[in-house]
């Protein structure tokens, strides 16, 4: 009896979770799972041939590919199916009854095992992902169960059977998805069959332990299923097969026969939670904030709050169409600064500033992208650089350019022609154009060019205690009537409004909060409009899409208006579009120097003559009537 001993077991695996595993878990949580905390499948391929000599168990490596349904395995690797339960709240993770949870997973393995003994092996991970701090709490469990009657009380070492071990190793290499095999009456290795093993009483198990003469705890699962299949089995030969050296054989004895052989829900002892690095039965915590690329963290963090909108509030919100929109900001002043900050908060990645001014000493307190040290430097380039400091992955560009203005005579035709060409090229390159410049006449040429290129225009303009935010209508609109642009209410062509102005007229004198209100509404109007392009309908998950928003701070009121395009509009009427198409820069040059030329082309001059004639006719009629009465 001195050679008899109680059979002990080693832990089944030692887990190694790669950073890519947590990155993929983060992506799935944000983009796919959201509030879904149900079981998600995992797949691992075990390499039983290349186990480090210092390891006591087979490493269980989990990477981003572990989430793939078709996880391509290499030669000699053993596929293992598992699952992960990612909780929404840290307290749910902490308060989970871990033993009950593992017992439930063990019952699932048991039910699979009595159908196919090779299916009684699995693993499970419980986790919580703190996506703001990049801290991940997790605990690996490998359900190992043992029925009281299947306890192996005494084992007796069997002399080395190298030839048999070699045959088993080769069989497992070919049958890579199998965990057990048996010997038949002819001493041939065959698939597990309870009728055969009842007679031969030889069971071979693929092992994941490297400890000398100590099998992994997974052995308990196979022995429990074996005794369920052969309830009267007491003595048998157990072969522990390792792909490298270390295989051994035992003459084993069950504690007793199985009185519960017909029970599908047996009394079982369950273990399998992995110990942490301190050797305690407790979860592990991984802080990836110091390991990941800061730029990668910034990129994911920028999108975090936006993606959380889709979890519960706006599941149909299309964030990609916003992120991929290229935005051109004409004006890098107060409006341009606030609009750009709202755009990057919505996830826009491509912004181009156009401005020809420099930062004055009065600007930094009202224009959020500039500091005192920036005074005297070009606005456009500084605004772009400031956005990149806020978010280094931002594709921000600054272009110093003077927009040719109607009513302002040409000073340097060659330079202004180049500015015109550059402006038109910029409008072609971008998807949405924001008009955020100071003067009315500087909005005319961008409005015309955007209409020519069928670009979406968002216009924002400020008064002292009022603001206007509007979207321009396009020629390709599906509706029967085209919406008006910024100039559709004009009865005269824009003229020079900058010359001979006093200081209070030259500076933008507004209540400080007006610019913030107009800027935020302009960006929100853009995001709502983009959702209609995605859905193809007038309704949007973000609500209404007004044409014009006029706000008045003196009584804190807001009006939503809609006006059609004006047939004599100096910026978007068909005659103006046709003239520009035919003449190009020559048309623009004439309009810049002679605003009345634009009135003639658009038909405003004829309209004014008709109105004047109508007025004369009315006065003549009144005179005739007065004569008759007299």
UniProtKB/Swiss-Prot annotation:
GO-annotated cellular components: phagophore assembly site
Keyword Transport included in the entry's annotation: yes
UniProt-listed GO biological process terms: autophagosome assembly; autophagy of mitochondrion; cellular response to nitrogen starvation; piecemeal microautophagy of the nucleus; protein modification by small protein conjugation; protein transport
Active site annotation, chain numbering: 507 (glycyl thioester intermediate)
Top-rank taxon: Eukaryota
Pfam families: ATG7_N, ThiF
UniProt cross-references to Gene3D superfamilies, sorted A to Z: NAD(P)-binding Rossmann-like Domain (3.40.50.720), Ubiquitin-like modifier-activating enzyme ATG7 C-terminal domain (3.40.140.100), Ubiquitin-like modifier-activating enzyme ATG7 N-terminal domain (3.40.140.70)
InterPro entries, alphabetized: Atg7 (IPR006285), Atg7_N (IPR032197), Atg7_N_1 (IPR042522), Atg7_N_2 (IPR042523), ThiF/MoeB/HesA (IPR045886), ThiF_NAD_FAD-bd (IPR000594), Ubiquitin-activating_enz (IPR035985)
Motif extent (GXGXXG motif): 331-336
Compartments reported by the entry: Cytoplasm; Preautophagosomal structure
Keywords linked to the UniProt accession: Autophagy, Cytoplasm, Protein transport, Transport, Ubl conjugation pathway
Signal peptide annotation: none
Entry's Gene Ontology molecular function annotations: Atg12 activating enzyme activity; Atg8 activating enzyme activity
Main location class: cytoplasm
Keyword Cytoplasm: yes
Domain notes per entry: The C-terminal 40 residues are required for homodimerization, as well as the interactions with ATG3, ATG8 and ATG12; and the C-terminal 17 residues are required for the ATG8 lipidation. The GxGxxG motif is important for the function, possibly through binding with ATP.
Similarity section: Belongs to the ATG7 family.
Record function comment: E1-like activating enzyme involved in the 2 ubiquitin-like systems required for cytoplasm to vacuole transport (Cvt) and autophagy. Activates ATG12 for its conjugation with ATG5 and ATG8 for its conjugation with phosphatidylethanolamine. Both systems are needed for the ATG8 association to Cvt vesicles and autophagosomes membranes. Autophagy is essential for maintenance of amino acid levels and protein synthesis under nitrogen starvation.
PANTHER family named among the record's database cross-references: UBIQUITIN-ACTIVATING ENZYME E1 (PTHR10953), UBIQUITIN-LIKE MODIFIER-ACTIVATING ENZYME ATG7 (PTHR10953:SF3)
SUBUNIT field: Homodimer. Interacts with ATG8 through a thioester bond between Cys-507 and the C-terminal 'Gly-116' of ATG8 and with ATG12 through a thioester bond between Cys-507 and the C-terminal 'Gly-186' of ATG12. Also interacts with ATG3.
Protein name: Ubiquitin-like modifier-activating enzyme ATG7
Organism whose genome encodes this protein: Saccharomyces cerevisiae (strain YJM789)
Classification of source organism: Eukaryota, Fungi, Dikarya, Ascomycota, Saccharomycotina
Gene name as annotated: ATG7
């Amino acid at each position: 009896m001195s050679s008899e001993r109680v059979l002990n077991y080693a832990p089944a695996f030692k887990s190694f979770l790669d950073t890519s595993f947590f990155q993929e878990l983060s992506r799935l949580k944000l983009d796919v799972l959201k509030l879904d905390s149900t079981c998600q499948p995992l797949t691992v391929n075990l390499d039983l041939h290349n186990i480090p000599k210092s390891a006591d168990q087979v490493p269980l490596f989990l990477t981003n590919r572990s989430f793939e349904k078709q996880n391509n395995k290499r030669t000699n690797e053993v596929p293992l199916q598992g699952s992960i339960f990612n909780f929404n709240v840290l307290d749910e993770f902490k308060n989970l009854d871990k033993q009950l949870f593992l017992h439930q997973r063990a019952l699932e393995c048991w039910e699979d095992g009595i159908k196919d003994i090779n299916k009684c092996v699995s693993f499970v991970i419980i986790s919580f992902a703190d996506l703001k701090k990049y801290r991940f709490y997790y605990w690996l469990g490998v359900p190992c169960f043992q029925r009281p009657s299947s306890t192996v009380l005494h084992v007796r070492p069997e002399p080395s059977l190298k030839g048999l071990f070699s045959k088993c190793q080769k069989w497992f290499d070919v049958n890579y998805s199998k965990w057990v095999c048996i010997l038949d009456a002819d001493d041939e290795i065959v698939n597990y069959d309870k009728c055969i093993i009842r007679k031969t009483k030889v069971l071979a198990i693929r092992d994941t332990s490297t400890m000398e003469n100590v099998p992994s705890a997974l052995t308990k699962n196979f022995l429990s299923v074996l005794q369920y299949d052969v309830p009267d089995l007491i003595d048998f030969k157990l072969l522990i097969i390792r792909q490298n050296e270390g295989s051994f054989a035992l003459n084993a004895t069950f504690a007793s026969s199985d009185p519960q052989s017909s029970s599908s829900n047996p009394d079982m002892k369950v273990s399998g939670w992995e110990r942490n690095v301190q050797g305690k039965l407790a979860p592990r915590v991984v802080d990836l904030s110091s390991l990941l690329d800061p730029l990668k963290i910034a990129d994911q963090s920028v999108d975090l709050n936006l993606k959380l909108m889709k979890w519960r509030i706006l599941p149909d919100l299309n964030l990609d169409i916003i992120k991929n929109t290229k935005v051109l900001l004409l004006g890098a002043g107060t409006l341009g600064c606030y609009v750009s900050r709202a755009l990057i908060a919505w996830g826009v990645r491509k912004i181009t500033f156009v401005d020809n001014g420099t930062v004055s000493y009065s600007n930094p307190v009202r224009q959020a992208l500039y500091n005192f040290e920036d005074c005297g430097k070009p606005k456009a380039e500084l605004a772009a650089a400031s956005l990149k400091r806020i978010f280094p992955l931002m594709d921000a560009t600054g272009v110093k350019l003077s927009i040719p203005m109607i009513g302002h005579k040409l000073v340097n035709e060659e330079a202004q022609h180049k500015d015109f060409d550059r402006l038109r090229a910029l409008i072609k390159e971008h998807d949405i154009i924001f008009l955020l410049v100071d003067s009315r006449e500087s909005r005319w040429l961008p409005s015309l060019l955007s209409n020519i290129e069928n670009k979406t225009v968002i216009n924002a303009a400020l008064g002292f205690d009022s603001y206007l935010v509007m979207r321009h209508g396009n020629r390709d609109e599906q509706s029967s009537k085209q919406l008006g642009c910024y100039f559709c209410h004009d009865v005269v062509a824009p003229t020079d409004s900058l010359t001979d102005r006093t200081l209070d007229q030259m500076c933008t004198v507004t209540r400080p909060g007006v610019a913030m209100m107009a800027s935020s509404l302009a960006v929100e109007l853009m995001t709502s409009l983009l959702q209609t392009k995605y859905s193809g309908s007038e309704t949007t998950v973000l609500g209404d899409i007004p044409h014009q928003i006029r706000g008045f701070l003196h009584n804190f009121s807001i009006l939503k208006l809609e006006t059609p395009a004006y047939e004599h509009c100096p910026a978007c009427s068909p005659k103006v579009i046709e003239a520009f198409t035919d003449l190009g820069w020559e048309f623009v040059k004439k309009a810049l120097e002679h605003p009345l030329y634009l009135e003639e082309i658009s038909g405003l001059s004829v309209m004014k003559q008709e109105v004047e004639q109508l007025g004369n006719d009315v006065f003549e009629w009144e005179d005739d009537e007065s004569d008759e009465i007299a």
